[in-house]
Amino acid sequence: MFKTILVEDNLVFRESLRDSLQLQFPSMKIAEAGDGLEALEKIDSLSPNLIFMDIRLPGQNGLQLTEKIKKLHPEITIIILTSYDIPEYREAAARFKADHFFSKDSMTQQEVNALVKSILTEKGFKRDGSKRHRS
């Protein structure tokens, strides 16, 4: 089963993203975290394939958290989500090894779905989030 964690302190945005992903990818297990500490706990217990990471989080910066996660779990795909689409953040996201960067203000659900489908395929999952069986 494909596992995702949504690390976002804005509850409305997090729930909207969760609902959209669940509708599009019904077999995907989705966990949520409202801050960096909760995210680290969920990573240890869930072993996710994908993380959607906000930059501005209570307690810990999402970029620093991304760097920490990538050092421990380089196989996890991390998508940065931010309302602050400035070159410095894009550069920092790349420097800290984030895999993708989306501006919350300009991203569309179709773009997110297409990217998630691509990640599913790359990691050996079916488009609905279930694991491919080898024959």
Regions found by a protein language model. Name each.
Residues L11-A31:
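Two-component/phosphorelay signaling modules centered on CheY-like receiver
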Residues E41, L63-P74:
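Short amphipathic alpha-helix used as the core "switch/output" element in two-component signaling
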